[in-house]
Amino acid sequence: MSSKANHAKTVICGIINVTPDSFSDGGQFFALEQALQQARKLIAEGASMLDIGGESTRPGSSYVEIEEEIQRVVPVIKAIRKESDVLISIDTWKSQVAEAALAAGADLVNDITGLMGDEKMAYVVAEARAKVVIMFNPVMARPQHPSSLIFPHFGFGQTFTEKELADFETLPIEDLMVAFFERALARAAEAGIAPENILLDPGIGFGLTKKENLLLLRDLDKLHQKGYPIFLGVSRKRFVINILEENGFEVNPETELGFRNRDTASAHVTSIAARQGVEVVRVHDVASHRMAVEIASAIRLADEAENLDLKQYK
């Protein structure tokens, strides 16, 4: 699906991290009632989708055992589903967690390993006829790259051969993303996942340099040319905050201004993404991002706007 074919407004996916250690909101929604209250808040602010995660993927985070992850996310999914038909995404790379979450009422699997971390994941998604976000994961493709070393290991075992990893090291970032997606999409096809159930995520903030992050964001339309909707997560990512810091803005999250600046900057990126026709943005602060989406989508869909004159504005 190209941006030209996307005649709908960008969907806002609100984040609920049911973890004690996520980089932005770890611990805030660890209890079931807190998570449910946050879900209600995000929906009221305009989220059409919620992304539920039970394991932090920030630099330095620890592996969460499968049963523990299931115990964190399934009660939250069941509670949300009991009172809302909002789309629910389960943020996990483990097939057993995905299977339990889908059975509990989730609609979509958001796999940060792009189906490459657990060889059973593609079959779980196919069996459930669920949608799946396949993320480009540079940490897995370039584990020895300086930008990857601070991240935890993703996946069971080694996903790529030593020769593949050596070849990946020399590829420009956009070529590396294409190579990764070719492998991931082949796995999806082999398992029987329907192409219309696939979204692609460029993996912003995962093992990328500042320049690589910016290049991938600038050229999102090239990713659209692969024929799939885009799912984008840039909210409160470190490289966005670094740009603010380099230019003298307050970014300390302990201050009201610093915290607000992080969301304002993230919303600016969402505006650029929505202008390019990105289908889904994954965000923490739905209210600010919704404003960005409304304005950017109105500009992108200008041909469909009402031709009001000044007298008709009230």
UniProtKB/Swiss-Prot annotation:
GO terms for biological process: folic acid biosynthetic process; tetrahydrofolate biosynthetic process. Mg(2+) binds at residue 17. Pfam families: Pterin_bind (PF00809). (7,8-dihydropterin-6-yl)methyl diphosphate binds at residues 57, 91, 110, 201, 237, 282-284. GO terms for cellular component: cytosol. Residues 10-294 form the Pterin-binding domain. Its EC number is 2.5.1.15. Keywords: Folate biosynthesis, Magnesium, Metal-binding, Transferase. GO terms for molecular function: dihydropteroate synthase activity; metal ion binding. Pathway: Cofactor biosynthesis; tetrahydrofolate biosynthesis; 7,8-dihydrofolate from 2-amino-4-hydroxy-6-hydroxymethyl-7,8-dihydropteridine diphosphate and 4-aminobenzoate: step 1/2. It comes from the Bacteria. It is an enzyme of class 2 (transferase). Belongs to the DHPS family. Catalyzes the condensation of para-aminobenzoate (pABA) with 6-hydroxymethyl-7,8-dihydropterin diphosphate (DHPt-PP) to form 7,8-dihydropteroate (H2Pte), the immediate precursor of folate derivatives. The sequence shown here is that of sul-s (wild-type). The protein of the spontaneous mutation to sulfonamide resistance (sul-d) has an insert of 2 AA. This is Dihydropteroate synthase. It comes from Streptococcus pneumoniae serotype 4 (strain ATCC BAA-334 / TIGR4). The lineage of its organism: Bacteria, Bacillati, Bacillota, Bacilli, Lactobacillales. The gene is sulA.
